[in-house]
């Protein structure tokens, strides 16, 4: 194993139709420079990341930022880290994080009946 997922930083809840940002922190735990990438899904739907892959120095931690639009249900994000062995991407680590759907409460207006007067 070369690419250790340190954490998934994402909100614990989000309203439907909002963009959810997912930051996956990955550390190169090998003694050599490594090409590292991250893939992830929410439930079974994949989502994009800012970088395809990065060259990471030994001991260095990098953040891969991904995003998706929150569906109308709770989701589980699963992320995988991968390192390049010279000819193939090798899966190194996996981590999950649950994100709950938040129901937005309609805001009550400050409008008052007394604001009207008869003409």
Where are these regions (language model features)?
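Viral virion structural and adsorption modules
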Residues: 106-119
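Asparagine-centered strand-capping/turn motif at beta-strand->loop junctions
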Residues: 26-30
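Structural beta-strand segments of beta-rich domains
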Residues: 18-22
């Amino acid at each position: 194993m070369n690419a250790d997922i340190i954490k998934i930083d994402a909100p614990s809840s989000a309203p439907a139709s909002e963009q959810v940002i997912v930051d996956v922190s990955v550390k190169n735990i090998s003694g050599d420079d490594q090409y590292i990438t991250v893939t992830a899904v929410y439930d079974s739907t994949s989502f994009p990341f800012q970088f395809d892959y990065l060259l990471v120095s030994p001991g260095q931690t990098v953040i891969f930022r991904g995003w998706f639009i929150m569906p109308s249900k709770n989701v589980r994000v699963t992320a995988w880290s991968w390192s390049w062995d010279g000819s193939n991407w090798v899966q190194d680590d996996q981590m999950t994080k649950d994100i709950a759907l938040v129901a937005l409460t309609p805001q009550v207006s400050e409008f008052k009946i007394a604001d009207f007067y008869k003409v």
